[in-house]
Amino acid sequence: MKLIETIKKYAQTQPDTLAFVNEEEKLTYGELWSQSERLAARIQSEALTDASPIIVYGHMKPVMAVSFLACVKAGHPYIPVDVSIPADRILKIINSSKAELLLNNSGTSVDTGDALISVVEPGVLEGDGVPETDPGRWVHGEDTFYIIYTSGSTGNPKGVQISADNLQSFTDWITNDFPVESGQVFLNQAPFSFDLSVMDLYPCLQSGGTLWTVTKDMINRPKLLFEALKQSNVNVWTSTPSFAQMCLMDPSYSEELLPELSLFMFCGETLPASVARQLKERFPKARVFNTYGPTEATVAVTSIEVTDDVLNKYSSLPVGSEKPETEIVIINEDGKAVQDGEKGEIIITGASVSKGYLGEKALTEKAFFSYNGSPAYRTGDAGYKENGQLFFLGRLDFQIKLHGYRIELEEIEYQINQSRYVQSAVVIPFYREEKIEYLIAMIVPAEHDFEKEYQLTSAIKKDLGSKLPAYMIPRKFMYQKEIPMTANGKIDRKRLKEEVTV
């Protein structure tokens, strides 16, 4: 695979160049290659089923990149799982994936329940002599390279399989069609269990750059983040728009703080025109790109540079035109392609489309199909095309994007309704300036002994904390005697939305 061969070349020609930096550790290309070779040999000694997935558990440490590379060198796809993921969800991923090995890079124990899975702590990967893996064993072509778990409507996460060819097509697009130069410093804001991280990790490594990671502690302590950014020399900023918006709240977030910054790449949620405008004012030398794509189509498939002309022309920004080897079609409810300017469902076809969900044949057949001989994916997103530009209009169903994370409201509702304190619940997104700011849980409570509503809320949140990641737990909880229904006997979500926005 070109990506792996390129990393090997950098390990040989520039072994002392930094590949990965976080607040505590650094890793060179030479170390990345040698340590991943040793770990790959260790993985191969485990006698795993051919091509079985390996869970890689941890946070923003260099050993995570070492582990990813080791897995694919050993012929196995990896499943990144961040330490922020609750234990209950990790168990579901273990059981769903049928993974036989978990690489624990967290420094703490991980509960694997009664699953038949080996847990290995990579530990010391230094040493004399470097074993050489057989390139013939490396993941390549249509082999699965990584599997990222996304929100599922039944309360069970779905594993999206991305092949080596999918990833190579995406990485080549970023390094060839965006103003990315060799040896640049890439900011990595997203945890590795979120596919936005793929937008910086692999283009960075393919271009001989340095990945500079933002940890949970930095996000929780902006002062620490800004002190670190000042020393970062970041050239390429990859994040959700929400993260940049948070940074813009500090007046010091400007060209003076990051004088080397030349490129912003956004994905994961809608980029408000107001945010793009502020960034161009604060960073006049930097170029801003808006992109769009679901996990099932390898991170992103469209892009547009947000210039002054674009900002003057559109109040809501387009998400751009397709990458090479990709076509986007807008279809109506009958499955027929619509005319330019007509709204419908966004269908993605071509080299970026995933092979489907791991172990979920029915779900795969529902979402993935062949369109004019090419692999295609039904996004469930609403949109339209105009003069070659795609406009994203949100979800057709109840799946949403919140701070870059794709969330199915049904999954949150399912988990809230499992609480003994809840009779019924509906989750409503609260919008501000064209994007979702937070979630509101509308609850009909079951009988309870709490005197105050905040005590009830705390108890429900405690139940949710063991089942859902923090970003999926609603910010506000509102209580009422009944959930309004439509004449058809369905939950009246429109009325609920109107009530919470008054």
UniProtKB/Swiss-Prot annotation:
According to its UniProt record, the EC number is: 6.2.1.54
Q: Name one GO biological process term.
A: lipoteichoic acid biosynthetic process
Q: Where in the cell is it found?
A: Cytoplasm
Q: Which UniProt keywords apply?
A: ATP-binding, Cytoplasm, Ligase, Nucleotide-binding
**Phosphoprotein is among the record's keywords:** no
Pathway terms, separated by semicolons: Cell wall biogenesis; lipoteichoic acid biosynthesis
The identity of this protein, by name, is D-alanine--D-alanyl carrier protein ligase
